[in-house]
Amino acid sequence: MPDLNERSSVGLRDELGAAEWQITESCFDAEKANTFETLFTVGNGRLGTRGTLEEGHVGEVSGTFLSGVYDGYRVPVIDLVNAPDWLSLGVFVNGVRLDVQSCTVVEHERALDFRHGVLWRRTVFADPEGRRTQLESLRFASFADRRLCAMRV
């Protein structure tokens, strides 16, 4: 299973063999976060949601896009319309916000399972007082009901 932190996105398709069904991220790197947001997109043909962190981070490019819905008419560049953000989530423990800006990321891993269409994440944060908290999430865009996206945290 390829670890994308160790590879460039150039030639990624060639690196993922036919037997490989997931891509992984083994640590959080703020400089590569937007690239991973693109790679960890979940979608079902009707809508797609970028693979941003649930709690957000500085510089993120969040977005949920609907197939066939565009902004612009008779203009040179037609853009996809950004639908409402259904991922935005604030996680607090004892009044301290858990995110990559406020806490130290002790462990972080994500995997996009292509076979099941699920994005999985596990992050361990250390807050400024040294307490450790593990955050896990799953998300998907349903093929059974293409209007449905779901997230479990």
Residue map of PLM features:
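Beta-sandwich/jelly-roll carbohydrate-recognition scaffolds of carbohydrate-active enzymes
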Residues: 2-152
